[in-house]
């Protein structure tokens, strides 16, 4: 007979004495893509499982359990992020043992409420990395993907079809520029906006977008970030994994090589504002 054990942990808001729950910590708007706090954490765990090949090894029909992780797992905040622990049998066989996932604050910081950011002990490096990820999302709206859009509300201008932008807190083109300025310098903001020609435009006082996503560079894998600070300025270094196509496996394979990119920034009102953004994807 296999012995059974269970892990339980609780976190408290020391300013109120109440339990810390994800619902209490989440912002109403979610992150820039509209992902809730729970969704942001879920996607990181999902990616960890995929990267390690665990879904092929011994996990079976686990996705619904992951999506409901606040109910089915034990959550514990640490100095590095959130530890999510599933006991035996929940998402894997007993022999696999408890499944423990560490999710860095930088992966879900942008979906936290402002109050949550004041009570969680998040390092400056993690907040800078979170700002970098937000800036990368904004970059992608101009050079790789589409921003959140309401496809049920459309308009046609000069033969081009536009969808209503569904970016939280952004109603107009000027509002989009203001959002950019939270994360990049005015020069970069104007460069990004200028690269789109008429893709983003105000129609009847609302921001509309022409769909034009191209997808990413498939020869680049995941990346890691480190931030070096010197007072109110610093440099974030992004180290990207290089991939090559494997004809036999019909898949992209790790070459064992990496490339590094540097992003200088200045801290403004607690946010990292980047003055260069050589994002390679």
Where are these regions (language model features)?
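Short, cysteine-centered beta-strand-loop-beta hairpins and adjacent loop/turn segments enriched
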Residues: 1-6, 91-95, 241-257
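Core segments of small alpha/beta cavity-forming domains
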Residues: 120-210
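Short glycine-rich, low-complexity/disordered patches
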Residues: 47-76, 143-156, 193-202, 275
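Compositionally biased intrinsically disordered regions enriched in Thr/Gly
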Residues: 1-130, 134
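Surface-exposed, charged secondary-structure patches
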Residues: 199-247
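Hydrophobic/aromatic beta-strand elements that line small-molecule binding cavities or substrate pockets
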Residues: 8-11, 222-227, 259-267
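Short beta-strand edge/turn micro-motifs at domain boundaries
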Residues: 14-21, 235-237, 256-281
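Exposed beta-strand-loop-beta-strand "reactive/processing" segments of non-cytosolic proteins
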Residues: 1-4, 168-173, 182, 232-242
């Amino acid at each position: 007979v296999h012995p059974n054990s269970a892990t339980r942990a609780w976190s408290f808001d020391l300013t109120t004495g109440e339990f810390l729950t994800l619902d209490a910590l989440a912002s109403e708007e979610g992150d820039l893509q509209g992902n809730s706090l729970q969704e942001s954490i879920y996607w990181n765990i999902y990616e960890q499982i995929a990267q390690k090949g665990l879904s092929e090894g011994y996990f079976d029909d686990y996705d619904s359990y992951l999506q409901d992780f606040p109910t089915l797992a034990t959550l514990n905040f640490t100095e590095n992020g959130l530890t999510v622990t599933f006991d035996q049998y929940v998402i894997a066989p007993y022999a696999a043992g408890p499944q423990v996932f560490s999710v860095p604050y930088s992966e879900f910081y942008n979906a936290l409420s402002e109050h949550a950011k004041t009570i969680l002990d998040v390092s400056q490096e993690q907040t800078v990395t979170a700002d970098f990820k937000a800036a990368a999302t904004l970059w992608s709206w101009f050079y790789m993907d589409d921003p959140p859009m309401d496809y049920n509300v459309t308009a046609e201008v000069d033969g081009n079809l536009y969808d209503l932008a569904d970016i939280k807190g952004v109603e107009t083109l000027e509002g989009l520029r203001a959002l950019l300025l939270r994360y990049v310098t005015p020069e970069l903001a104007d460069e990004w906006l200028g690269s789109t020609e008429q893709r983003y435009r105000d129609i009847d006082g609302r921001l509309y977008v022409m769909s034009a996503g191209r997808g990413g560079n498939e020869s680049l894998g995941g990346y890691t970030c480190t931030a070096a600070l010197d007072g109110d300025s610093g440099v974030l270094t992004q180290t990207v994994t290089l991939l090559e196509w494997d004809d036999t496996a019909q898949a992209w394979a790790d070459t064992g090589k990496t490339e590094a990119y540097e992003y200088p920034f200045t801290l403004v009102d607690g946010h990292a504002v980047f003055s260069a953004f050589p994002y390679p994807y």
